[in-house]
């Protein structure tokens, strides 16, 4: 066992003395057992994490019952919703790297034999996955579970996105402040990751398809007693994984990634899943290119439409309809789409995991013969504005905005764009451009939920598009095209845009372009002053120096 490095032999007497002082060692026989890290992300700042302390306690008990010795430690976490719309959002994506580095540090420094990872919200799950693949010791994921959707006294179903969009509605006078407060009070009824197919829930659902989590991980709500049973089962299972030396890189094959992307496209997951999955693939040493995604999307039907694409369905409804296993079972009937032989942490193949799954509500999970669209709910666009690609959540774009051409309304910062939208500077037909908000330019590639919600709230969702080198919340909806690569800070073509330039978006054709010649774009870029970093001290300054483009997952490169 790896942990023998810190516990076996007379030379390790000082180490054993310290281990006894932790209280985790109950008898000398514990030194013959695997040391299991309980990697918890409990904190009181994120509603999706406030209940994780109890899950950690249950996990420790289950590990001990299964024959392991548990040691709990914590990671940081950022609530994207609370960090939204101010400087805090610049730290969100950057926190993923800190989480990965910190989990790696603890597991390697203490020679842990395996990990039970308890994440929930946006950057915590991918950060822990990146670390798991980096250190490559047995691991199992069990998330905190989704929040239930909210309901107003009048019976209206609401969620966090309802509140963001209601701010825009209040600003243009379509609802009163009292009506806004009513939505605010009922949108988030309890603990859990926000209730739609936003980034947190998307990643926790993908954990099942990747093979890192037990069935039910992505959809059983946080307050459901079955969530506690899932924690127990996962925590018992890690001891078997250690004994059989089943490691993350054994599970995360190229085909497992394709399985996850197929699920992602079928349920219209957050655009951030592409960013994170590329970063996870990098840690596994797997090369995966943006351009491959459209080919997979072309043969993956969009069969499960969840908020923000519709307010009629939330994650709890997906669970009731059969969960992720039911979606995968439906997809498995498409010849060659899924690799059902992929191994998983259950000890069974993906095919065995979903063998008995069935769709219990066809209004939530459609048949592959009756999809919302014949192609997946995410797409990569290319053109002279995004030579290296840009990402759009097609499942949340209205039919009339699938093709759009209009004049650019250019902003060099998200705050300026929000002000312009709220003050009425953005008109029907415009294409809002928010640049210098990419991984380097932001820095941190902040999410654009506030401007997209303002557009929707002001009734412009069917007439205004938004493109950015930043990214979007999983809760954004509308013609929102992000991850434009190269970004403005790296002299990408988006930096050459001027107000009034005509931008054409053709999502079915997977293209996005501006009506400018290549020579004009080059001339404009040559006239720009050198990019000046917005933040010059602290972690974000270091992050901006090392981070790579969005089309590679916005991972940290090397000096």
Swiss-Prot record:
Q: Does the keyword Iron-sulfur apply?
A: yes
* SUPFAM superfamilies linked to this entry: IlvD/EDD N-terminal domain-like, LeuD/IlvD-like
Question: Pathway it acts in?
Answer: Amino-acid biosynthesis; L-isoleucine biosynthesis; L-isoleucine from 2-oxobutanoate: step 3/4; Amino-acid biosynthesis; L-valine biosynthesis; L-valine from pyruvate: step 3/4
EC number annotated for this UniProt entry? 4.2.1.9
The reply to whether Ligase figures as a keyword in the UniProt entry is: no
Active site residues per record: 473
Tell me where in this chain the PTM N6-carboxylysine is found: 123
What is the enzyme's class at the highest EC level?
A: lyase
Q: Which reaction does it catalyse?
A: (2R)-2,3-dihydroxy-3-methylbutanoate = 3-methyl-2-oxobutanoate + H2O; (2R,3R)-2,3-dihydroxy-3-methylpentanoate = (S)-3-methyl-2-oxopentanoate + H2O
Q: Which residues bind [2Fe-2S] cluster?
A: 121, 194
Q: Which GO terms describe its molecular function?
A: 2 iron, 2 sulfur cluster binding; dihydroxy-acid dehydratase activity; magnesium ion binding
Q: What does the entry give for GO biological process?
A: isoleucine biosynthetic process; L-valine biosynthetic process
Q: Any note on cofactor binding?
A: Binds 1 [2Fe-2S] cluster per subunit. This cluster acts as a Lewis acid cofactor.
Q: Name one Pfam family in it.
A: ILVD_EDD_N
Q: Which cofactor does it need?
A: [2Fe-2S] cluster; Mg(2+)
Give a GO cellular-component term: cytosol
What is said about its interaction partners and assembly?
Answer: Homodimer.
Entry's PANTHER family? D-XYLONATE DEHYDRATASE, D-XYLONATE DEHYDRATASE YAGF-RELATED
NCBIfam families (UniProt xref)? ilvD (TIGR00110), PRK00911.1 (NF002068)
Which family, according to the similarity comment? Belongs to the IlvD/Edd family.
Its annotated function is as follows: Functions in the biosynthesis of branched-chain amino acids. Catalyzes the dehydration of (2R,3R)-2,3-dihydroxy-3-methylpentanoate (2,3-dihydroxy-3-methylvalerate) into 2-oxo-3-methylpentanoate (2-oxo-3-methylvalerate) and of (2R)-2,3-dihydroxy-3-methylbutanoate (2,3-dihydroxyisovalerate) into 2-oxo-3-methylbutanoate (2-oxoisovalerate), the penultimate precursor to L-isoleucine and L-valine, respectively.
Protein name, as recorded = Dihydroxy-acid dehydratase
Protein's organism = Chlorobium chlorochromatii (strain CaD3)
The gene designation is ilvD
């Amino acid at each position: 066992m790896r942990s023998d490095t810190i516990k076996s032999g007379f030379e390790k007497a000082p180490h054993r003395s310290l281990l006894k002082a932790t209280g985790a060692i109950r008898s000398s026989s514990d030194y013959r057992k695997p040391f299991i890290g309980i990697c918890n992300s409990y904190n009181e700042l994120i509603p999706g994490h406030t209940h994780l302390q109890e899950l950690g306690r249950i996990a420790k008990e289950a590990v001990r019952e299964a024959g392991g010795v548990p040691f709990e430690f914590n990671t940081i976490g950022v609530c994207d919703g609370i960090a939204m719309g101010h400087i805090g959002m610049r730290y969100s994506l950057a926190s993923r790297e800190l989480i990965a580095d910190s989990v790696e540090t603890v597991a390697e420094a203490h020679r842990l034999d395996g990990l039970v990872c308890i994440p929930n919200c946006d950057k915590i799950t991918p950060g822990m996955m990146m670390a798991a693949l980096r250190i490559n010791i047995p691991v199992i994921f069990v998330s905190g579970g989704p929040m239930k959707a909210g309901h107003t006294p009048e019976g209206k179903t609401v969620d966090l996105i309802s509140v963001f969009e209601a701010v825009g509605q209040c600003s243009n006078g379509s609802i009163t402040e009292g009506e806004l407060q009513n939505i605010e009070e009922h949108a988030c009824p309890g603990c859990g990751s926000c209730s739609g197919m936003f980034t947190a829930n998307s990643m926790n659902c993908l954990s099942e398809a990747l093979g890192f989590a037990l069935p039910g991980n992505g959809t059983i709500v946080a307050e459901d007693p079955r969530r506690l049973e899932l924690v127990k089962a996962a925590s018992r299972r890690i001891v078997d994984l250690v004994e059989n030396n089943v490691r993350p890189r054994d599970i995360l094959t190229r085909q497992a990634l394709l399985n996850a992307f197929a699920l992602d496209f079928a349920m219209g997951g957050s655009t951030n899943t592409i960013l994170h999955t590329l970063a996870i693939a990098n840690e596994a040493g797997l090369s995966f290119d943006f351009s491959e995604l459209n080919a997979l999307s072309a043969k993956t039907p969009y069969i499960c439409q969840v908020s923000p694409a519709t307010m009629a369905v939330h994650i709890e409804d997906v669970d009731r309809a059969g969960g992720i296993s039911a979606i995968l079972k439906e997809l498995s009937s498409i010849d060659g789409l899924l690799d059902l032989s992929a191994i998983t942490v259950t000890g069974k193949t993906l095919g065995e995991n979903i063998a008995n799954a069935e769709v219990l509500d066809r209004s939530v999970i459609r048949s592959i013969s009756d999809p919302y669209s014949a192609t997946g709910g995410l797409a990569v666009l290319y053109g002279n504005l995004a030579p290296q690609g840009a990402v759009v959540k097609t499942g949340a774009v209205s039919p009339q905005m699938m093709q759009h051409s209009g004049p650019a309304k250019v902003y060099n910062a998200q705050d300026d764009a929000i002000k312009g939208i709220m003050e009425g500077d953005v008109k029907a037909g415009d294409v809002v451009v928010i640049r210098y908000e990419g991984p380097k330019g932001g820095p941190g590639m902040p999410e654009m939920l506030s401007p997209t919600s303002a557009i929707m709230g002001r009734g412009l969702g069917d007439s205004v598009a938004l493109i950015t080198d930043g990214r979007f919340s999983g809760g954004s909806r509308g013609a929102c095209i992000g991850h434009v690569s190269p970004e403005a800070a790296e002299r990408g073509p988006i930096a050459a845009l001027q107000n009034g330039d005509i931008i054409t978006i053709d999502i079915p054709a997977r293209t996005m372009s501006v009506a400018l010649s290549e020579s004009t774009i080059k001339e404009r870029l040559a006239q720009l002053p050198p990019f000046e970093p917005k933040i010059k001290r602290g972690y974000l300054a270091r992050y901006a120096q090392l981070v790579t483009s969005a089309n590679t997952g916005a991972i940290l490169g090397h000096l």
